[in-house]
């Protein structure tokens, strides 16, 4: 089963890039060489509208547009005004400083896992709509829920063209949806894919009270991305063997999956997880040892 991982872009970005890189992401001219090239007209229109607003706006309006102040605001202005002449960098590297991408640690993944992420990852971007992780992009700043003069909210602007491109791509795939609400708002999932998998994380205290994880959820999603591509995970069942940080475990009673295998997986970190994880490891090791012994016995009989 083919799978796709839907990822958000990151606010934190690696500056710089290669000014001599082949213009694979050619939003700068009429040529189209990037994966989602059908989105180029919308990209150019949004970039032009954004740059026009920057030139016309005062500091207060720019602070509202980008959600930052001071030196960070000036860097955002400079980056966005320089988009058409900036050096380029693969999206997965550009977003590398972002918390989720740092937790995935693309550079530290095995070569096969890197290839699977490049081939199966799709990134939602406020400025570019959809990206492959290896699409070449400049430095920029624009959130998916930002409102640009003459365009409106980026997520609304992208909804129709993005949905058309994405729905065609993921048809028949298992879809790991790791998008926050602001990014998912840009996608009209009219067909409600049966194989779409969402993962929710909760912490449980000694009294059994659960709270949804907000602080730290990006790190967990990054670790999940690494696990998916390392294990070529195309079903929610694969999460039973995942050992994420802080002992999160699948709660099968709260997890809701349909017949096609899609739905919401609930993972919980609760007191005593260290003991339970050690017991599971011991049980798996015993099963593996028994299987190996049985295999040797069969081979000896064949001889």
Locate each region found by the language model:
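Near-N-terminal "mature-domain entry" segment
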Residues: 2-142
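Intrinsic disorder/low-complexity signal
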Residues: 284-303
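Short, surface-exposed beta-strand/loop "edge" segments at domain boundaries and coil↔beta transitions
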Residues: 14-15, 273-278
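Internal, well-folded beta-alpha domain core
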Residues: 106-275, 283-286
């Amino acid at each position: 089963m083919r799978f796709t991982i839907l990822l958000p872009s990151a606010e934190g970005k690696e500056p710089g890039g290669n000014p001599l890189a082949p213009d694979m992401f050619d939003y700068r001219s009429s040529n189209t060489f990037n994966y989602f090239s059908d989105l180029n007209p919308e990209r150019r229109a949004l970039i032009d509208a954004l740059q026009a607003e920057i030139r016309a706006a005062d500091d207060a309006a720019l602070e509202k547009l980008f959600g930052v102040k001071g030196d960070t605001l000036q860097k955002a202005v400079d980056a966005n005004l320089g988009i058409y002449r900036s050096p380029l960098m693969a999206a997965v590297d550009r977003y590398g400083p972002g918390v989720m991408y740092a937790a995935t640690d693309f550079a530290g993944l095995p070569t096969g896992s890197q290839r699977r992420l490049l081939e199966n990852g799709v990134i939602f971007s406020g400025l570019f709509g959809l990206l492959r992780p290896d699409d070449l992009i400049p430095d920029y700043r624009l959130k998916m829920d930002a409102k640009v003069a003459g365009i409106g909210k980026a997520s609304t602007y992208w909804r129709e063209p993005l949905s058309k491109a994405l729905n065609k791509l993921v048809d028949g795939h298992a879809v790991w949806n790791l998008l926050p609400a602001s990014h998912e708002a840009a996608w009209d999932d009219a067909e409600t894919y049966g194989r779409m998998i969402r993962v929710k994380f909760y912490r449980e205290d000694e009294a059994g009270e659960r709270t949804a994880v907000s602080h730290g959820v990006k790190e967990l999603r990054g670790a999940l991305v690494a696990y998916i591509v390392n294990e070529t995970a195309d079903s929610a069942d694969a999460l039973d063997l995942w050992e994420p940080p802080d002992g999160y475990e699948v709660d099968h009673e709260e997890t809701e999956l349909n017949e096609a295998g899609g739905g919401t997986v609930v993972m919980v970190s609760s007191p005593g997880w260290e003991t339970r994880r050690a017991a599971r490891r011991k049980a798996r090791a015993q099963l593996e040892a028994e299987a190996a012994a049985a295999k040797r016995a069969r081979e000896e009989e064949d001889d």
